[in-house]
């Protein structure tokens, strides 16, 4: 059953493509419609009673849509309406030919004809094809039962004019659903990573525990805390003159800058002592001391 319906669907698609490539003359279409109405009027009346009973049993209500588009001969499926006859369908068809505003909004039922105006073989199955009118660039086709949708029969060659073949796959996931799924996955992964890191920090290994000292306070020492004294730096100055050496020794605070020459500097940080063990007994701490011979220099 599925293969047969797929065959009819493919045939219907081929007929639609042929009508697009070579549109029929409107006069030919009207003549073919008139001939078809005359021949099918008797069959329609015979099927009205059986179709009405079946519609009441299955609660089926299908609208009577006329055909759409130039060059496509069509006929409303009035036999699905139960009590509605062919005369009302003829009136709707005439009104539809004069009104082209419905071409872009309605889903139409198509009866396919060949170029001679005769109905194509298998049209009773092919007329279940629904085509969205106005969608010339990409025609989407629905029809048949679930088995035909899952069949392996090829839907035909791609349209050389750019029409894409019917897409029988599942509908894509909406962007909102995708964004929600991604956020949930990322949130779960981040939470798991944080838990793993917290567990690793709590685990201690013997002999490899890292003890991090506390960050020292940036507060200044209070008055009760005495500042640490830095100390002194021993300075020596040598002057050569006619074979004689003039030597001067003294102490400068550690915070003072090292310069060339005999310079006795003062403490600028307030943490260096006034005297040290080397200069406490040095008489030259206040005055320059001259040593005229190398032998006179104390060790």
Curated annotation (Swiss-Prot):
Keyword vocabulary terms for this entry: Host cytoplasm, Host-virus interaction, Inhibition of host innate immune response by virus, Inhibition of host interferon signaling pathway by virus, Inhibition of host MDA5 by virus, Inhibition of host RLR pathway by virus, Inhibition of host TYK2 by virus, Interferon antiviral system evasion, Metal-binding, Viral immunoevasion, Zinc
Which InterPro entries does this one have? Paramyx_V_Zn-bd, Paramyxo_P/V_N
GO cellular component entries: host cell cytoplasm
Which residues hold Zn(2+) 2? 255, 267, 269, 272
Biased composition of type Acidic residues is found at: 137-160
> Which residues lie within the region annotated Disordered?
56-79, 137-186, 205-229
**Localisation:** Host cytoplasm
Residues holding Zn(2+) 1:
232, 251, 276, 279
Q: Which GO terms describe its biological process?
A: symbiont-mediated suppression of host cytoplasmic pattern recognition receptor signaling pathway via inhibition of MDA-5 activity; symbiont-mediated suppression of host JAK-STAT cascade via inhibition of host TYK2 activity; symbiont-mediated suppression of host type I interferon-mediated signaling pathway
UniProt GO MF annotations: metal ion binding
Quote the record's miscellaneous comment.
Highly virulent strain of Rinderpest virus can blocks the phosphorylation of host JAK1 kinase, thereby blocking the type II interferon signaling as well.
What family name appears in the similarity comment?
Answer: Belongs to the paramyxoviruses V protein family.
Function, in words: Plays an essential role in the inhibition of host immune response. Prevents the establishment of cellular antiviral state by blocking interferon-alpha/beta (IFN-alpha/beta) production and signaling pathway. Interacts with host IFIH1/MDA5 and DHX58/LGP2 to inhibit the transduction pathway involved in the activation of IFN-beta promoter, thus protecting the virus against cell antiviral state. Blocks the type I interferon signaling pathway by interacting with host TYK2 and thereby inhibiting downstream STAT1 and STAT2 phosphorylation.
**Subunit structure, interactors included:** Interacts with host IFIH1/MDA5 and DHX58/LGP2. Interacts with host TYK2; this interaction inhibits the type I interferon signaling pathway.
Task: State the name under which the record lists this protein.
Answer: Non-structural protein V
